[in-house]
UniProtKB/Swiss-Prot annotation:
Protein name listed in UniProt: ATP synthase subunit a
Subunit organization: F-type ATPases have 2 components, CF(1) - the catalytic core - and CF(0) - the membrane proton channel. CF(1) has five subunits: alpha(3), beta(3), gamma(1), delta(1), epsilon(1). CF(0) has three main subunits: a(1), b(2) and c(9-12). The alpha and beta chains form an alternating ring which encloses part of the gamma chain. CF(1) is attached to CF(0) by a central stalk formed by the gamma and epsilon chains, while a peripheral stalk is formed by the delta and b chains.
InterPro entries tied to this protein: ATP_syn_F0_a_bact/chloroplast, ATP_synth_F0_asu, ATP_synth_F0_asu_AS, F0_ATP_A_sf
Entry's transmembrane regions: 29-49, 86-106, 118-135, 188-208, 209-229
Chain's gene name: atpB
CDD domains registered for this protein in UniProt: ATP-synt_Fo_a_6
Record's function text: Key component of the proton channel; it plays a direct role in the translocation of protons across the membrane.
Length: 233
């Protein structure tokens, strides 16, 4: 089943890339294949837009300008001018996750974000990146972000903050995985119980859900970066 639709065969199965063998061990490869598909689609759209840039934008250029411009304004409004430096990453995260999510709506495809490994990789990258930015900005003083507002609270706040930060990758991973996989399962049930035409409104509801989940991941990443940039009190 693909993207919640009762489809008998996935494209990855037809191409024999569901699994690969590494050192005698069989490894699931399907989610990697569809991640590459999402990357290829996004990269191709970017090349098309870049090659057809006009003073009077066309339809596709208009869509990209509205989405990217709106996201950049949102980031700068929340983080400040530092947001412009990290926006390419934040915008890339949003579009990358969005296209991965949307693949789940295509018959014969499966959403890579419905696999916990894909989400864990992205969450660990975000964890490393915002801590890197914090260390780059504040140096050893970045540790003050974990120590609380008053010195006497440090023995209590330090372990709590470390646990809180270490839980962030797990939270990002499971939130995206649970919502996307849950949508896939519910959509399968809807399409099995009713004709396709009768479930089209529900289909568009799931489309909205996939956009929302990409935005939530993007927004949480932005919040973590904002915390890393702020001066510790």
């Amino acid at each position: 089943m693909a993207g919640g639709l009762p489809h008998p065969v996935l494209w990855s199965t037809l191409l024999n890339v569901d699994t690969i063998t590494i050192g005698g061990a069989t490894v699931e490869f399907k989610h990697v294949f569809y991640t590459w598909c999402a990357m290829a689609i996004l990269f191709s759209l970017g090349l098309i837009v870049r090659s057809s840039l006009k003073v009077v934008p066309g339809a596709l250029q208009n869509v990209f300008e509205v989405v990217i411009g709106g996201l950049e304004d949102f980031v700068v409004g929340n983080i400040g001018e530092d947001g412009r430096k990290v926006f390419p990453l934040l915008g890339g995260i949003f579009l990358f996750i969005l296209f991965q999510n949307l693949l789940g709506l295509v018959p014969g495809c499966d959403a890579p974000t419905a696999n916990v490994n894909t989400n864990a990789a992205m969450a660990l990258f975000v964890f490393g990146y915002y801590n890197y930015q914090g260390l780059k900005r504040w140096g050893p003083g970045y540790i003050k972000h974990f120590m609380g507002p008053m010195t006497w609270l440090t023995p209590l706040m330090l372990p709590l903050e470390i646990i809180s930060h270490c839980a962030r990758p797990l939270s990002l991973t499971l939130r995206l995985f649970g919502n996307i996989r849950g949508e896939e399962i519910v959509m399968v049930l809807f399409f099995l119980m009713a004709p396709i035409v009768g479930t089209l409104p529900v289909y568009f509801l799931f489309l909205l859900g996939k956009v929302l989940q990409a935005f939530i991941f993007f927004m949480l990443t932005m919040v973590y970066l904002k915390g890393a940039f702020e001066h510790a009190h």
